[in-house]
Amino acid sequence: MGKINVAIIGAGNCASSLVQGLHKYSEIDEGSQRIPGLMHNVLGGYTLSDVNIVAAFDVDAEKVGKDLSEALVSKNNNAIQFFDVPNMGVKVDRGMTHDGIGEYLEDLVEVNHDPSTPGGQTADVVGILRDRE
């Protein structure tokens, strides 16, 4: 079987827990003991090691341009750290803010809107997804 390529939209707390879990339990297979929180060790013939994060997008200036492993532990994230995620080689690209950001985040997240500076220009999301499929 092949890999399941995944793009992360928003490198926040949920993404942090997901990526930590993918790394911590990457050796789990059909014969492994059941892990609390993981409903199935194998699903449709795929294991967690088959999930490959190929792209990540965010609008937070603290995260854009960093490796995903670094962005997931930025100051605005407060998910419990249960696994030290190694450098993934996945740069967080600037996502879209055409409809703004949520009211609960607008006072916490600094968004760079200056397209002439690094991280201020919205990335070519479609192009990135096509290139990394």
Feature-to-residue mapping (PLM):
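N-terminal glycine-/serine-/threonine-rich beta1-alpha1-beta2 phosphate-ribose binding loop
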Residues: 1-133
